[in-house]
C-alpha cells in the first residue's frame, strides 16, 4: 500500500513538472528597477524602409545588458517582437519568427522584412528568457517596408 502511494505521488509530481504552466508559475520572476526603460533607437516610429533590410538599434536605461544564463541583479537581454503582441509576461518568451532572442547581449540586429507594415517592440528577458517584474518593454512602433 505504501509503495503504491509513493509511486502515485511520484507520478503526480512528474506530471506537474512536465506541465509548463506549472513550471512557469512556480518560478519567481527576476526583479527589475521600477524606472527601467527599454526603447528602440532606430528605426523611428513611422519610418519607411526601402528594400526590406534594416538594422534595429536597441536601447535600455537604468538596467544593464548581459548574455542569457547570467543571473545578476538589474540585468537582462533584449527580445525583439515582430508583428505580434507581448507574450504572457509571467512565462518564458517564445523563440520563433515573431519573438527574436538576442541572448548574447546584442544591442543591434539586422532584419529582413517583406514589403508592408510591420510592428516592432522590445521586451527584456532575464537569464531564463522570462520577463522581469515589473516587465521592461518598449513602446510598439510601426514601420513600412517598400
Report the location of each language-model feature.
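N-terminal export leaders
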Residues: 3-7
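Short acidic/polar inter-strand loop motif in beta-rich domains
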Residues: 87-89, 125-133
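Short coil-to-beta strand junction motifs in C2/discoidin
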Residues: 70-78, 137
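Short amphipathic, basic-aromatic surface patches that mediate peripheral association
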Residues: 59-70
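Short beta-strand elements
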Residues: 134-146
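A glycine-anchored, Pro-Gly-centered beta-turn/N-cap motif
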Residues: 52, 76, 114-116
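Short, compositionally biased P/S/T/A/G/V-rich stretches that sit at domain boundaries
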Residues: 27-51
Amino acid at each position: 500500500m505504501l509503495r503504491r502511494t509513493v509511486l502515485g505521488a511520484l507520478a503526480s509530481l512528474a506530471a506537474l513538472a512536465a506541465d509548463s504552466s506549472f513550471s512557469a508559475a512556480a518560478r519567481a520572476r527576476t526583479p527589475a528597477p521600477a524606472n527601467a526603460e527599454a526603447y528602440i533607437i532606430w528605426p523611428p516610429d513611422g519610418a519607411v524602409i526601402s528594400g526590406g533590410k534594416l538594422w534595429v538599434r536597441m536601447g535600455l536605461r537604468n538596467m544593464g545588458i548581459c548574455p542569457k544564463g547570467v543571473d545578476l541583479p538589474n540585468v537582462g537581454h533584449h527580445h525583439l517582437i515582430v508583428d505580434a503582441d507581448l507574450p504572457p509576461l509571467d512565462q518564458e518568451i517564445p523563440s520563433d519568427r515573431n519573438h527574436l532572442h538576442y541572448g548574447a547581449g546584442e544591442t543591434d540586429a539586422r532584419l529582413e522584412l517583406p514589403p508592408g507594415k510591420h510592428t516592432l517592440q522590445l521586451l527584456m528577458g532575464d537569464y531564463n528568457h522570462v520577463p522581469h517584474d515589473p516587465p521592461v518593454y518598449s513602446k510598439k512602433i510601426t514601420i513600412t517596408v517598400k
